[in-house]
């Protein structure tokens, strides 16, 4: 199976995660998207909300969309959520699957700062969601890497389908001007204004946040 992996703190999970993931699934004809909540993200500040609540919210989204499955290997680990470690575990547990790790252009620009980042290409394909506002400078090492990988894929043509790892797939996605930080601030300031939140969050996530009084 061809599996997309989308990691994040999901604090909370919102349409800015959900819609691009569905667009990637359709663009690359993936069988499923696995949502992988972080426990201790190594590249940014830790989550504001506890593990159990973030896990429950992701599970709610998975129950609403059969395109998604919950992948809990990172959130159950007490060490930093290094992507290479997670993908090593996944490829060992599911050797029959072909994994596509999904990231935004903002993350791809900084990929060379990630722990053992080059090993990722031995474990999976990389999907780069191209959204407005993020441009790769021609002098960037990542720009060179993307150009080389995309050229290699063009030369290989149909044979790329037989390669289970090592490619970069740029995917144009619809702009989603949504961030978890802004959602948390909005909830804190407005005390759960459903009308304002409904374009940002699924209804069952709004209900969950309200029920458990999160982000107050």
Curated annotation (Swiss-Prot):
Q: From the UniProt record, list the coiled-coil ranges.
A: none
Protein's GO biological process: NAD biosynthetic process
State the InterPro entries in the record.
Cyt_trans-like, NadD/NMNAT, Rossmann-like_a/b/a_fold
A Pfam family cross-referenced in the UniProt record is CTP_transf_like
Give the metabolic or biological pathway: Cofactor biosynthesis; NAD(+) biosynthesis; deamido-NAD(+) from nicotinate D-ribonucleotide: step 1/1
Q: What is its EC number?
A: 2.7.7.18
Q: Which reaction does it catalyse?
A: nicotinate beta-D-ribonucleotide + ATP + H(+) = deamido-NAD(+) + diphosphate
Q: Which domain of life is it from?
A: Bacteria
Which UniProt keywords are listed?
Answer: ATP-binding, NAD, Nucleotide-binding, Nucleotidyltransferase, Pyridine nucleotide biosynthesis, Transferase
Q: What class of enzyme is it?
A: transferase
Q: Which GO terms describe its molecular function?
A: ATP binding; nicotinate-nucleotide adenylyltransferase activity
Q: Which residues cross the membrane?
A: none
Biological role: Catalyzes the reversible adenylation of nicotinate mononucleotide (NaMN) to nicotinic acid adenine dinucleotide (NaAD).
Q: Which family does it belong to?
A: Belongs to the NadD family.
This protein's name: Probable nicotinate-nucleotide adenylyltransferase
Record organism? Shewanella denitrificans (strain OS217 / ATCC BAA-1090 / DSM 15013)
The taxonomic lineage of its organism, from the top, reads: Bacteria, Pseudomonadati, Pseudomonadota, Gammaproteobacteria, Alteromonadales
Originating gene = nadD
């Amino acid at each position: 199976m061809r599996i997309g992996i989308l990691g994040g703190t999901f604090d909370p999970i919102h349409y800015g995660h959900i819609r691009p993931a569905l667009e990637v699934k359709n663009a690359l004809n993936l069988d499923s998207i696995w949502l992988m909540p972080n426990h201790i993200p190594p590249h940014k500040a830790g989550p504001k909300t506890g593990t159990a609540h973030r896990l429950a919210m992701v599970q709610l989204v998975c129950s609403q969309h059969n395109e998604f499955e919950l992948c809990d290997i990172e959130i159950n680990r007490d060490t930093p959520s290094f992507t290479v470690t997670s993908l090593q575990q996944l490829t060992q547990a599911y050797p029959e699957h072909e994994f596509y790790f999904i990231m935004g252009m903002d993350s791809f620009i900084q990929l060379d700062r990630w722990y053992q980042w080059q090993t990722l290409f031995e474990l999976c394909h990389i999907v780069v969601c191209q959204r407005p506002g993020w441009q790769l400078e021609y002098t960037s090492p990542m720009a060179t890497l993307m150009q080389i990988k995309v050229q290699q894929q063009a030369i290989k043509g149909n044979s790329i389908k037989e390669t289970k790892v090592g490619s970069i797939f740029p995917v144009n996605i619809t702009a989603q001007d949504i961030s978890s930080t802004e959602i948390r601030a909005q909830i804190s300031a407005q005390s759960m204004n459903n009308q304002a939140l409904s374009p940002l969050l699924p209804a069952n996530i709004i209900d969950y946040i309200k029920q458990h009084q999160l982000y107050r």
